[in-house]
């Protein structure tokens, strides 16, 4: 299957509703992906990083203070016809926000965090997914090793499990089959802390390690 075909039939979904409590002094009342670097919003760098892939659509899920998000960014995105922004009436977290994809009739999709850049080949990630799994997570090196729960990649069959002080961590880039949405209810929840742990335990998701450029704000 050609690389171009893979992404032409897949949506890119960006989680852009984070509050950014760790960097609040730099954000003010703005959503985390709206922080500026060199007079450019971070989410614009995220979009530029993924513009080389020919996605069917780009769907941005906006949560925290989404009005500011639209006021600041809407003019810059108006010429990008494939981009759709979805506002949340109430904050649903990184898990609950994905329920908005059901009304968009989303099938298989790539999911990325709006506060992360992980410059990997998404075609490679998608092609690596086993037919028996419903998703795959891109993993990167954990240089700080401070998180309590990090994803470690087993040596056999690319099976994921949790391990403290692991040298490998979740890179914030995923490819999911549409079946993942059946595991998410329309209520506030965390993808990282509630939904993924259950799916990992059921062995329905796998991991793939990449040694590419990674930054998380």
Language-model regions, residue ranges each:
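Glycine-rich phosphate-binding loop at the start of an alpha helix
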Residues: 44, 95, 99, 192
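Catalytic-core segments of class I nucleotidyltransferases/pyrophosphorylases
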Residues: 109-110, 117, 123-130, 142-145, ...
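Extended acidic/charged loop-beta regions that coordinate divalent cations
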Residues: 153-157
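N-terminal glycine-rich phosphate-binding loop and ensuing alpha1 helix
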Residues: 2-69
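Generic beta-sheet signal
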Residues: 15, 37, 61, 86-88, ...
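Conserved beta-loop-beta/alpha segment of the NTase-like Rossmann-fold superfamily
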Residues: 67-150
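Residues at the starts of beta-strands that form the adenosine-phosphate
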Residues: 11, 56-58, 82, 108, ...
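Conserved beta-strand scaffold positions in the cores of enzyme catalytic domains, especially
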Residues: 34, 83-85, 135, 205-207, ...
């Amino acid at each position: 299957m050609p690389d171009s075909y893979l992404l032409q039939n897949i949506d890119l979904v960006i989680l852009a509703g984070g509050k950014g409590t760790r960097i609040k002094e730099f954000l003010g009342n703005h959503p985390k992906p709206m922080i500026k670097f060199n007079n450019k919003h971070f989410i614009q760098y995220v979009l530029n990083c993924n513009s080389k892939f020919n996605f069917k659509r780009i769907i941005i899920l906006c949560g925290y203070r989404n009005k500011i998000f639209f006021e600041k960014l809407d003019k810059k995105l108006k010429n990008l016809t494939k981009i759709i922004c979805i506002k949340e009436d109430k904050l649903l977290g990184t898990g609950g926000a994905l329920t908005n994809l059901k009304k968009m009739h989303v099938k298989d999709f790539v999911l990325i965090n709006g506060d992360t850049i992980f410059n990997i080949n998404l075609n490679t990630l998608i092609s690596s997914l086993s037919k028996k799994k419903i998703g795959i997570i891109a993993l990167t090196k954990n240089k700080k090793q401070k998180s309590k729960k990090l994803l470690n990649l087993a040596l056999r069959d690319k099976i994921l499990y949790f391990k403290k002080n692991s040298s490998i961590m979740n890179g914030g880039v995923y490819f999911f089959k549409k079946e993942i949405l059946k595991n998410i209810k329309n209520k506030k929840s965390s993808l990282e802390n509630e939904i993924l742990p259950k799916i990992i335990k059921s062995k329905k998701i796998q991991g793939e390690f990449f040694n590419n450029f990674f930054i998380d704000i």
